[in-house]
Amino acid sequence: MEKQYKVGIVGATGMVGQRFVTLLENHPWFKLTVLAASGRSAGKSYEDAVGSRWAMTTPMPESVKKMTVLDASKVEEVASQVDFVFCAVNMPKDEIKALEEAYAKAECPVVSNNSAHRFTSDVPMVVPEINADHIEIIPAQRKRLGTKRGFIAVKSNCSLQSYVPALH
């Protein structure tokens, strides 16, 4: 793949966000360009924002240590710098739904690790080996949200994604 997609992590300082950081390091398809988190972390370097809470077994990648964390609630600022975001925020479900829809409405696709939209009828919950065709619902979601490019797709929970392929 020649093009690398510019991606952001919304909820970058939490444990799931940290995991996304490690997974995206040196990824051939994705270039991590934005780290976003709560207002408490905004304006700090990623290293300072996370501090001693780094929970991964590998050291924090050098490539992200000095990146400035953006405020995840400043949707337009984040969305303007990426092709899409991975969402790993830790907040009440109604707030997650509103935030993810705000990103989608800003024409920024959202790949969510959260459960907030898992039962939203026009949001695909994708296990690629099993139901990749479920992305066909995205045009209906875009119509509801009034978007051309923005949408939300969610992953299943970790237990489900591990045993569904074997059952299929």
Show the residue positions of the predicted features.
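N-terminal Rossmann-like NAD(P) cofactor-binding subdomain of oxidoreductases
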Residues: M1-H168
